[in-house]
Amino acid sequence: GVACRCDSDGPTVHGDSLSGTLWLTGGCPSGWHNCRGSGPFIGYCCKK
């Protein structure tokens, strides 16, 4: 999958730690949670 930035990764410009995985449809898989809050964002940023 494609890495995405969770809210807990912080708003840093350089050296972002992308700990989430991008899911475009259907929300996060079972056992995962959406780690990205509000804002203009396509899909879901999911984390185990």
Curated annotation (Swiss-Prot):
<dbReference type="InterPro" id="IPR000693">
    <property type="entry name" value="Anenome_toxin"/>
</dbReference>
<comment type="similarity">
    <text>Belongs to the sea anemone sodium channel inhibitory toxin family. Type I subfamily.</text>
</comment>
<keyword id="KW-0800">Toxin</keyword>
<keyword id="KW-0738">Voltage-gated sodium channel impairing toxin</keyword>
<dbReference type="GO" id="GO:0005576">
    <property type="term" value="C:extracellular region"/>
</dbReference>
<dbReference type="GO" id="GO:0090729">
    <property type="term" value="F:toxin activity"/>
</dbReference>
<keyword id="KW-0166">Nematocyst</keyword>
<keyword id="KW-0964">Secreted</keyword>
<keyword id="KW-0872">Ion channel impairing toxin</keyword>
<protein>
    <recommendedName>
        <fullName>Delta-actitoxin-Bcg1c</fullName>
    </recommendedName>
</protein>
<dbReference type="GO" id="GO:0017080">
    <property type="term" value="F:sodium channel regulator activity"/>
</dbReference>
<dbReference type="InterPro" id="IPR023355">
    <property type="entry name" value="Myo_ane_neurotoxin_sf"/>
</dbReference>
<dbReference type="GO" id="GO:0009966">
    <property type="term" value="P:regulation of signal transduction"/>
</dbReference>
<feature type="disulfide bond">
    <location>
        <begin position="4"/>
        <end position="45"/>
    </location>
</feature>
<keyword id="KW-0528">Neurotoxin</keyword>
<dbReference type="Pfam" id="PF00706">
    <property type="entry name" value="Toxin_4"/>
</dbReference>
<dbReference type="GO" id="GO:0042151">
    <property type="term" value="C:nematocyst"/>
</dbReference>
<keyword id="KW-1015">Disulfide bond</keyword>
<feature type="disulfide bond">
    <location>
        <begin position="28"/>
        <end position="46"/>
    </location>
</feature>
<comment type="function">
    <text>Binds specifically to voltage-gated sodium channels SCN1A/Nav1.1, thereby delaying their inactivation during signal transduction.</text>
</comment>
<feature type="disulfide bond">
    <location>
        <begin position="6"/>
        <end position="35"/>
    </location>
</feature>
